[in-house]
């Protein structure tokens, strides 16, 4: 069970090393929620492109040993797992950011068999492995930017 009101999310950005139409893609979220699910609004990535995500959040109480467990699914099938340590967080901190990956870039596969839908499920845990928040998002990998750019 998630302990409410300790972590609240503020923003979500997908950042690209190169992308026609801008390097940043901001996705609207419900500010103040500790359970964000953007899986019904996937963004698009060209195969082979480098990207990372940035999640803005705030903490209302101190958090010890904050970690983020990241589960990747491809078409609902488990595809990979990662854990990223964040560390200790002070109470009443408003301008925190979580970058994934922490260093460098992720790269979308260029193999045709890897094109398609992906879902990332992030579980934020701290204070003795207590569930604090969840953040889910999805994206599609396409063979070229023409098919990858969002339709507005």
From Swiss-Prot:
It is found in: Cytoplasm. One of its GO terms (biological process) is regulation of Rho protein signal transduction. Keywords: Cytoplasm, GTPase activation. One of its GO terms (molecular function) is Rho GDP-dissociation inhibitor activity. InterPro entries: Ig_E-set (IPR014756), RhoGDI_dom_sf (IPR024792). Coiled coil: none annotated. One of its GO terms (cellular component) is membrane. Belongs to the Rho GDI family. Regulates the GDP/GTP exchange reaction of the Rho proteins by inhibiting the dissociation of GDP from them, and the subsequent binding of GTP to them. This is Putative rho GDP-dissociation inhibitor 2.
